[in-house]
């Protein structure tokens, strides 16, 4: 029997789900649920990363021995490490107001059509691109110290096993990834003076990145919506999905992006 542990983070709470696969059947149950309470700190609205990480460890303890574990969260948010591999600050939450006005400013460097064509990502001021532009303009000293960016699912994995990896589904929410080549968009990085070295190596969903207390730490589909779509009980072709949470996303699966 295989035992796996999934940590799912929503806007108001997180949960640890223990799954078991035996004789061709999957069963699962919630072993731990906890509040996700972002807070105002140091001039920004932030994730309470220390508290959430403590609940991750508690969830793993409640689950007992497992073969593997993984994380999913919403997209766009990230943490920054310095050159010594230390978290520089609590990650800023997408509901923070630091990106106000930056979408229009960004169009001066790369017009909307070109930006969408390069990334296929809906242009929203919460996207990681605009969060990085805010960092460049408003906190240049912090920007200079930033050595590595890890999106939130990868940041939790790093905190448990030390691995620095960037899973592609969560990277796709950043407005920095080329969906056709599944690599960073050189056009976008160049236009906004973002060094590619800031990002950890891209890995595909399902990659084993490390180990925590004897369990494999897996970079699953880190973006919660894409994680849900992957598990959707639907035909392989000609199926649409409507994923409803804090907001709703409508889409369909295709062999290649439509841009």
What annotation goes with each model-predicted range?
Residues 1-89, 117, 145, 200, ...:
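N-terminal glycine/serine-rich phosphate-binding loop of ATP-dependent small-molecule kinases
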Residues 9-11, 115-225:
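Gly/Ser/Thr-rich active-site cleft segment
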Residues 14, 73, 129, 227-229:
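Short glycine/serine/threonine-rich phosphate/pyrophosphate-binding segments
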Residues 38-39, 100-101, 208-210:
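A short acidic, often aromatic-flanked loop/helix-cap motif at beta-alpha or helix-coil junctions
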Residues 48, 69, 96, 135, ...:
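Residue-level signal for inorganic ion chemistry
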Residues 57-64, 136, 157, 230-231:
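Generic structural signal for well-ordered alpha-helical scaffold segments
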Residues 78-83, 87-106, 146, 150-184, ...:
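Glycine-rich phosphate-binding loop of actin/hexokinase-like ATP-binding domains
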Residues 108-112:
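Conserved FAD-binding subdomain of flavin-dependent enzymes
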């Amino acid at each position: 029997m295989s035992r796996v542990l999934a940590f799912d983070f929503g806007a108001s709470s997180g949960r640890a789900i223990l799954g078991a696969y035996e004789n061709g059947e999957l069963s699962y149950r919630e072993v731990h649920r906890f509040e996700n309470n972002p807070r105002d700190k140091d001039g920004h609205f932030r994730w309470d990363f220390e508290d959430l990480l403590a609940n991750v460890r508690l969830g793993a303890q409640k689950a007992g021995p497992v073969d593997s574990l993984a994380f999913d969260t919403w997209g766009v948010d990230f943490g920054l490490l310095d050159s010594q591999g230390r978290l520089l600050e609590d990650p800023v939450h997408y509901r923070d107001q630091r990106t106000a006005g930056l979408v229009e400013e960004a169009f001066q460097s790369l017009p909307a059509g070109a930006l969408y064509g390069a990334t296929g990502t809906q242009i929203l001021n919460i996207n990681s691109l605009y969060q990085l532009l805010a960092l460049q303009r408003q906190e240049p000293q912090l920007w200079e110290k930033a050595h590595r960016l890890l999106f939130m699912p990868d940041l939790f994995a790093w905190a448990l096993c030390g691995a620095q990896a960037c899973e592609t589904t969560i990277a796709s929410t950043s407005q920095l990834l080329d969906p056709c080549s599944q690599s960073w968009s050189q056009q976008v990085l160049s236009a906004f003076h973002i060094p590619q070295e800031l990002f950890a190596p891209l890995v595909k969903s399902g990659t084993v990145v490390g180990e925590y207390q004897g369990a494999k730490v897996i970079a699953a589909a880190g973006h919660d919506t894409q994680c849900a779509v992957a598990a959707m009980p639907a035909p392989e072709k000609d199926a649409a999905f409507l994923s409803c949470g804090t907001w709703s996303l409508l889409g369909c699966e295709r062999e290649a992006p439509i841009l």
